[in-house]
Regions:
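Conserved NTP-donor binding/palm subdomain of two-metal-ion nucleotidyltransferases/polymerases, i.e.
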Residues: 2-129, 135-358
Length: 358
């Protein structure tokens, strides 16, 4: 077990067989070929975890590009075709909603998969389980009321009690709405870790308008705001440091697509500055360290050194453990620290005696 594997044991990080898959997807040609053989011996495709399954379309493209032979080729091609159709259907259902919002004067910023699709160059290789968008906090209450009238039902755990929308918005960062097989995740804060009213100010300032289209339709698409590269990588990494019930590992190729697209031109000082401003050094440093040590990602060592958490750093480490551990494994103290970290980011002050753990 590598040092990084021991460091992440018991948390949300990719398991041994998932790391093999990631080496196929993200390593050089020679390493990819060896890793593919080992991965095929290690997994039973009939029982594969959801996180790995989501990357089968990307694996199809990778083995095709490298000319690798695998008995799984027909299944991988089928997974790619299925994902292509699913993503098409999702965008056809959701983009008209976003277009209506922009026509009504609501600024809409694409997050997560929707913001990353163009970087993959193919709508069929990157999974989209939903469409995540960010709107200004002031617009969110009206949109949360309007979506149900248009046939979108709130997820059971996201529906605020009547008249309690403000309470809902103060407690979390987003709400999901479903219609048929499509889902929109409406965000008023880009990250669950930072609910402060001004937390996304620089994200909005650095974003740029760009058309988001459905390939093959010939239409002009919908003009949305897209995050700057620095903000997109921060979102990908912080989200990747959270536990997920599906053992999601899509964040790894997402991050590497961004880093390899920009190479030496990537603005590392801006990324470090944003992480410090939002007190998110711990999850960013841990994910970047994983990418560097496991997959030889072009992450400079001085960047990791610059991401030391500021005092009281125990709060942010405890928050990291609370968010990256499976439910029931985080301690009460870790969960309390996660809430304290949100309070500090929102401009609050810690109670007396919280500068160091007791």
């Amino acid at each position: 077990m590598s040092a990084i594997s021991r460091r992440h044991a018991g948390l949300c990080w990719p398991r041994a067989h998932q790391r093999l898959l990631l080496r196929v997807l993200c390593g050089d040609a020679d390493r990819a070929s060896v890793a593919l053989e080992k991965w095929q011996q290690a997994v039973d495709l009939a029982r594969i975890d959801a996180g790995s399954l989501a990357l089968m379309p990307l694996l199809h493209r990778r083995v095709s590009e490298l000319g690798l032979r695998t008995p799984l080729a027909p299944l991988l091609k089928g997974a790619y075709r299925w994902r292509w159709c699913e993503n098409q259907l999702l965008l056809r259902e959701t983009l008209p909603v976003l277009a209506r919002w922009t026509t009504e004067g609501v600024p809409v910023l694409a997050l997560k998969g929707l913001a990353l699709l163009r970087r993959y160059g193919n709508i069929g290789v990157r999974p989209l389980s939903d469409v995540d968008v960010l709107v200004p906090r002031s617009h969110a209450p009206a949109l949360m009321r309007a979506l149900p009238t248009a046939g979108w039902r709130a997820r059971a755990d996201d529906a605020p009690p009547p008249g309690r929308t403000d309470d809902r918005m103060a407690a979390t960062h987003a709400a999901g709405f479903i219609r048929g097989r499509a889902e929109i995740d409406l965000h008023w804060a880009s990250l669950a870790e930072d609910l402060s009213p001004g937390g996304d100010e620089r994200l909005w300032q650095r974003s740029a308008a760009a058309p988001v289209t459905i390939p093959g339709t010939g239409g002009p698409g919908v003009s949305l705001r897209l995050p700057a590269t620095v903000d997109l990588l921060l979102q990908v990494c912080v989200h990747g440091a959270r536990w997920s019930r599906t053992s999601a590992i899509t964040w790894v190729p997402d991050a590497l697509v961004i880093l390899r697209e920009h190479g030496a031109a990537f603005d590392w000082p801006a990324l470090v500055a944003e992480a410090r401003a939002r007190r998110l050094q711990v999850p960013l440093a841990e994910t970047l360290r994983f990418l560097r040590e496991e997959l030889d990602a072009p992450v400079p060592a001085h960047v990791l050194a610059a991401l030391d958490a500021e005092a009281p750093d125990w709060i942010y480490w405890s928050e990291y453990f609370a968010r990256s551990a499976a439910p029931g494994r985080a301690t009460t103290a870790d969960r309390a620290a996660a809430r304290l970290a949100q309070i500090v980011r929102a401009g609050g002050t810690l109670p007396a005696g919280f500068s160091e753990p007791s």
